[in-house]
């Protein structure tokens, strides 16, 4: 018998095809008499669903119908509801409450949610999936990414798993949103949809995922999960209008992990900045594909001034990577820290030049 590894495109139609979403997976396999065999348990762990073997008929029956319920059952214990009174001294109405959703990221009571959920919330109460109530404390908050950390006094909580490779998320991939829409009595509501779009900037400083899974008030801070039960995003916002349907947005897992890493290590996001006020081209503003550079409106840091950058220069690239919008620049700078040096390529006085620029710390938050 020969032990091999196969990479199979798992598109078997219907729900299963949605589960695979075009991703390939590597599974240990063996070749017996020229036929390739894999363990059913290994296959199910990748594509979900259930399978049973009938020893009498020697038939193996696969059922994809349990994929979504299984994912919801797996993830829901890691989802919490968050409620509190708005911190408004003029609000005396006892029914004046704000609520949202959160995701457990550490078993000792650390919960990630949206900054806009808890920024003005007083006397935070967190309710876990088993109905237990805890007093919550806002620990870190980052308005730029719209993410925050809340702490409760609890142990042995089930943590959610962030997508191991968030960059493999694809348009058309099935996803599930879990949260607390509209009313606190609707905790752990699940809605199903697909990834509708990638790299959406909308009104965010970073790229967002677009989904048609129903996102309603109160879903903010809850997880958007794939059919492996991995969190691919944190639900954040939606477009609302009489002529608009099913346009929700989530903060991608890579941005969530970036912010969490900074929260844990620094207690805040140490966000780098070029120290420049930049204006996007008309094409970039309206969302057209463009290679037009951004224009320097003002120099706002001493480091940028020392580098010789001046108003009117046009920024083409940073470290050799073209940037045509503020979001593209912000995404690129996630790999850097204040104090590090980058190469900036600019058109200045008719000449295309590259300068060394020391990154400043952004004060945007």
Language model regions located:
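Primary recognition of N-terminal secretory signal peptides and signal-anchoring hydrophobic helices
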Residues: 1-65, 76-77
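N-terminal activation segment of mature serine protease catalytic domains
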Residues: 57-93, 101, 123, 170, ...
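A conserved glycine-rich beta-strand in the N-terminal activation segment of trypsin-fold
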Residues: 63-70, 86-110, 114, 132-135, ...
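C-terminal cap/linker of serine protease catalytic domains
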Residues: 67-72, 227, 231-287, 353-355, ...
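Terminal peptide-recognition signature
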Residues: 77-82, 102, 109-113, 136, ...
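Conserved active-site neighborhood of the chymotrypsin/trypsin-like protease fold
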Residues: 86-87, 106-185, 205-207, 321-327, ...
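PDZ/PDZ-like groove recognition
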Residues: 88, 214, 264-332, 340, ...
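Active-site loop architecture of trypsin-fold serine endopeptidases
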Residues: 89-97, 117-124, 157-159, 178-193, ...
């Amino acid at each position: 018998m020969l032990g091999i590894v196969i990479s199979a495109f798992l598109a078997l139609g219907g729900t299963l095809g949605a589960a695979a979403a075009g991703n390939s997976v590597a599974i240990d396999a063996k070749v017996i008499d020229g036929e390739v065999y894999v363990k059913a348990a290994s296959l199910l762990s990748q594509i979900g669903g259930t399978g049973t073997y009938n020893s009498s008929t020697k038939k193996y029956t696969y059922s994809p119908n349990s994929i979504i319920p299984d994912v919801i059952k797996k993830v829901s214990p890691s989802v919490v509801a968050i409620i509190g009174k708005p911190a408004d001294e003029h609000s005396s109405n006892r029914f004046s409450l704000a609520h949202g959703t959160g995701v457990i990221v550490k078993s000792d009571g650390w919960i990630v949610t949206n900054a806009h959920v808890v920024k003005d919330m007083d006397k935070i109460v967190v309710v876990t999936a088993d109905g237990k109530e805890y007093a919550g404390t806002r620990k870190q908050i980052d308005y730029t990414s719209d993410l925050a950390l809340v702490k409760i006094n609890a142990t042995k909580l089930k943590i959610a798993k962030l997508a191991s490779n968030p960059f493999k998320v694809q348009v058309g991939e099935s996803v599930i949103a879990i949260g607390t829409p509209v009313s606190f009595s609707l905790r752990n509501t699940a809605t199903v949809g697909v990834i509708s779009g990638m790299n959406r900037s909308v009104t965010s400083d970073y790229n967002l995922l677009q989904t048609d899974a129903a996102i309603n008030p109160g879903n903010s801070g809850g997880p958007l999960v794939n059919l492996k039960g991995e969190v691919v995003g944190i639900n954040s916002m939606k477009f609302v209008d009489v002529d608009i349907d099913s346009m929700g947005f989530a903060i991608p897992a890579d941005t969530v992990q970036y912010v969490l890493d900074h929260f844990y290590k620094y207690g805040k996001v140490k966000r780098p900045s070029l120290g420049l006020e930049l204006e996007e081209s008309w094409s970039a503003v309206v969302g057209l594909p463009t290679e037009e550079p951004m224009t320097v409106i003002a120099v706002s840091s001493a480091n940028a001034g020392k580098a010789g950058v001046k108003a009117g220069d046009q920024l083409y690239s940073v470290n050799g990577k073209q940037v045509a919008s503020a979001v593209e620049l912000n995404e690129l700078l996630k790999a850097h820290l204040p104090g590090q040096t980058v190469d900036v390529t600019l058109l200045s006085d008719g000449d295309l030049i590259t300068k060394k620029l020391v990154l400043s710390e952004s004060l945007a938050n």
